[in-house]
């Protein structure tokens, strides 16, 4: 919360180099005084977000996330939750990448947020939202898995997907949309909505995806 003012402005200026901001949320307040959901910060900042479902995915997201951030020229928010942050697991490591060379912005004014510059930069950020959605639709962290029973479709976000699979060790009979990268992938979301009678949303925290889903459906 204390860093949100700077964070919002980083989204408007953009970044020159990779930047991942990791937020450790605490659903159910196991070791803090509130259970704020940091996904709302990423949403109002209009930037991409990661939400890993397990330790391997957390490693993979950080490994590829710096390159993704540098390619977009925007910071990436990565949301962790208590049960993932307070656990440990072996992960498959990847080869170390060489450090990219230093480069400088062609227009240094993008980092000077006087109102005239900020308005221009904000228009640039707004114009890139479809690009961010397309990146989510093509992301390996968002996966649609079909199932024979179309009475229910499940959207499982972050560690919620891990919880779901623990209850279906032999595979889930319902179609499942796993969410690990935001903004929500519209193509896969509509595929699930059009295929199923009802939708269940599994998310650890506040109803972030549920509210967006109601917006898509025009209810609530």
Predicted ranges, named:
Residues 24-26, 163:
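Beta-hairpin (beta-strand-turn-beta-strand) motif
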Residues 24, 43-51:
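Glycine/charged-rich beta-loop-alpha catalytic/anionic-binding loops adjacent to active sites
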Residues 16-18, 45-47, 73:
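Short glycine-/polar-rich loops that comprise or flank the Walker A/P-loop
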Residues 2-7:
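Short, small-residue-biased leader/transition segments that mark boundaries at the very start
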Residues 1, 16-23:
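A short, small-residue-rich loop immediately preceding and capping a beta-strand
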Residues 9-16, 27-44, 215-218:
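Flexible glycine/proline-rich, aromatic-decorated loop/lid segments
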């Amino acid at each position: 919360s204390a860093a949100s003012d700077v964070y919002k402005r980083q989204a408007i200026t953009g970044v020159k180099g990779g930047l991942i901001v990791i937020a450790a949320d605490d659903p159910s307040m196991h070791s803090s005084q509130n259970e704020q959901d940091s996904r709302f910060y990423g949403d109002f900042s209009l930037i991409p977000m990661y939400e890993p479902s397990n330790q391997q995915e957390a490693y993979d997201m950080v490994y590829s996330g710096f390159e993704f951030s540098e390619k977009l020229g925007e910071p990436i928010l990565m949301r962790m939750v208590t049960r993932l942050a307070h656990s440990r697991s072996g992960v498959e490591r990847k080869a170390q990448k060489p450090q990219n060379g230093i480069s400088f912005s062609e227009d240094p004014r993008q980092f000077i947020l006087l109102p005239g510059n900020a308005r221009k930069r904000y228009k640039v950020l707004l114009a890139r939202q479809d690009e961010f959605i397309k990146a989510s639709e093509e992301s390996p962290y968002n996966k649609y898995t079909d199932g024979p029973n179309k009475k229910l479709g499940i959207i499982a976000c972050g560690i919620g997907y891990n919880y779901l699979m623990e209850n279906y060790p032999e595979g889930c009979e319902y179609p499942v949309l796993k969410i690990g990268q935001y903004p929500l992938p519209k193509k896969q979301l509509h595929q699930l909505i059009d295929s199923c009678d009802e939708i269940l949303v599994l998310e650890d925290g506040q109803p972030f995806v549920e509210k967006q889903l109601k917006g898509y459906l025009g209810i609530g």
